[in-house]
Amino acid sequence: MRKLVLLCFFLCWIQSSWSQKKEQFTFGYSNAKLTKVLSDIEKAFDVKYSYVDSLVTSQNFSLPKKLYSLTEINFEIEKQSALQVVKINDRFYSVNKAPETDDSEKIIRLEEVVVEEFLAKGIKKTNQHYIISPQKVQTLPGVTDADILLSLQQLPGVKSPNETATGLYIRGGTSDQNLILMDGIRLYHPGHLFGMISSINPNVEQTVSYYNKAVNPKFGERVSGIIDIKSTDQITEKLKVNAGINALNADVYIQTPLVKNKLGLQVSGRKSYTEWLQSPTFNQLENKVFQNTNFEDFDKDNQFRFYDYSAKLNFKPNAKSMISLSGLVIKNDLDYKNIIKADSINNQRMNIENYGFSLNWTQKYSRKFTQRVLVFYSLYSFDYLKKQDYDIDKFEAFKKLNRVVDSGAELNFGYQVNEKSNLEFGYQVFGNDISHLFNSYNQDIGIDLSLRHLYNVTHAGFAHYRQDFGTWNFQPGLRYNYYSQIKASSFEPRLLIQKTLDKSLILQASYERRSQVLSQVRENAANDLSLENYVWVLSDNGKYPIQKVNQFSTGFIFKKDNWLLDVDAYYKNITGITSFTLGFLGQNDNEIHHGQGFTKGVDVLIQKSVASWRAWMTYTYQDSQNQFEALNDGDYFSSNADIKHSFNVAFNKKWDNFLFTTGWFWHSGKPFSTINDSGEIASYNAERLPDYHRLDISGSYQFQNPKGNTFKIGVSIYNVYNHKDLISKEFERKYSDVSDFITPRYTMQNYYTLGIMHNIFFRVNL
């Protein structure tokens, strides 16, 4: 780590011999002529704009007074006018008439951007959802390389109490209730290192839309958060390379034109180097992940590695058509051997894969009517083997398999009624093929402990309407699902109402109903990896019912004098949940209990922004409870997601090319159940863990060489004061003798937080 830090300072020293041009200047305008604005920019940044006078002379321009970079002010020009600023080289720019706006961009206008910089540059909030551009996001506390799922955890109401990137609890929901899409490809394992980092390369040029309420009815399949990731459809004019390395992995992202303005290719790859070098960062994550297991140090013989690759081909045959083909590969491999004695070896292997591809076709038939077609395929595969060899001829083994095949198509139409209203409607069909197998065997015999294979086809129709009435905005919607295998259906109304009282105050209210037939259940079999003891199952409307959620929310946004106050209160109830208390090795179906639950809470954000710094505070209150007739005497008890209070405060400061940010995070303890002296459950989530807290800091420095290549270095420190918290108490099923198969007995395992962890990165854009 010391060598990596020295490398950063060395690179900073090299940069000092390069161009020292100031990167930001103060601008402020109120209805000024754009010709004057361009002249001011030319003088400040020593650049030149070429344009046709008739395009610019009639344009006026307004801008809040603060520091702006050249890129930022060019973006504002494009945003406020029907113009496009094109970079010719480092000094010369041309101002042209912008390409004709398509219907999707008009829809975005109706989804007004309420907050331009929410927490940080690169994060916006519309009246319906959040938009994150990872490649533009400023450094966040403790986050390296703008990890998408870790960045989401900075938002109000998003928690990960087990300190993973993928374990997102959104408004009382669990991680399997979140739908994650990548260009339409369903992701069932969006993490590396057992979920400690996201498997979505944040350095790909893409946008992330995050929904936690009033979800557009084109989205179904899950009952909690929606994370819709879309890589760019733009065809670059020249080769672009973005590459980097941090303390865990190296990555590269390449965009290149194949046919000018017609055909473009983008590819990305990211791979760990932990099989050759175990950094202190990896060792810290390893210690966290493999608590309460027999895994020790990793080396060339005992390895854990991961990689992800993606590719996208964009084809624009004409001005009204766009066709793109996307592919994605995510893989995690574990191979660990433990020599117990000379003639006995314990070997554990795990392979987790998520593959997928999608085809997107957008066709604009007129200025008002657009068609979109999506075809997708996704495969998730989990393969775990635990084997103990006693000698050449004797062994015992346990095998666990879980497989999900998800494929389908969507036909979507958009009709722009007028400048203030838009209609979107369509049809979807997709199939889910899900299976799992638990098998125990030796050299003489094999026993299937659990085997399940189900298939379902879902047909869905949806419609969504947006209408502006002056200061009112209405967005009603409806989705209908038919689940063919179980012959069940669901109607899902959605509604968002927004009222703008004045320039400072916006009121909102929303309602939605959603359903879910895919879910994860916990198994307590012979698996030594507590973070991977869940399997995907499909609802059969019997053992595993359909989960259904209703959510109501209301709130307001207040903006004035660089202050922002965002308050949103909500209530949601859920039916069809199950409590898999005993695992798959139980002997009767009564072990699966059906229940219901509710979550009520409020999310609050206060933010202050000025030219060179920003500070914010978020607070969430939440009460989340479940009820099962056969458990806890039928009384409600706290759910695993019930964290009553969470609070964080953060601050970032920019000095020219240097950005520093820090944040302190606190939440009250999770609930946990207790067991008695006999190893039986004594209470259900009646006790609380200690409060959790940590301090994170991050810093980055960006510079350019005379050729215009951009370099960026950064450091993050997670849990600066190395505070160790108990974050989880988990039951582990005991199978000491035959009686344990009849009367369930458990042991309690304690799991602790990460200690202090450093990370460092270096990136280059060519």
Feature-to-residue mapping (PLM):
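Short, acidic, small-residue-rich periplasmic hinge/interaction motif at the N-terminus
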Residues: 38, 42-45, 81, 88-141, ...
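Periplasmic N-terminal accessory/gating domains of Gram-negative outer-membrane beta-barrel systems
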Residues: 78, 124-176, 184-202, 207-215, ...
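Transmembrane beta-barrel wall of Gram-negative outer-membrane proteins
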Residues: 248-273, 290-333, 353-371, 375-377, ...
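C-terminal beta-signal and adjacent terminal beta-strands/loops
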Residues: 274-276, 280, 666-676, 701-766
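Flexible loop and strand-edge segments within Gram-negative outer membrane beta-barrel domains
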Residues: 322-371, 379-405, 452
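Surface-exposed extracellular loop regions of Gram-negative outer-membrane beta-barrel proteins
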Residues: 381-383, 438-440, 484, 503-552, ...
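Outer membrane beta-barrel strand-and-loop segments of large Gram-negative receptors
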Residues: 406-410, 450-454, 458-462, 545, ...
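Gram-negative outer-membrane beta-barrel transporters
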Residues: 468, 473, 570-573, 592-675
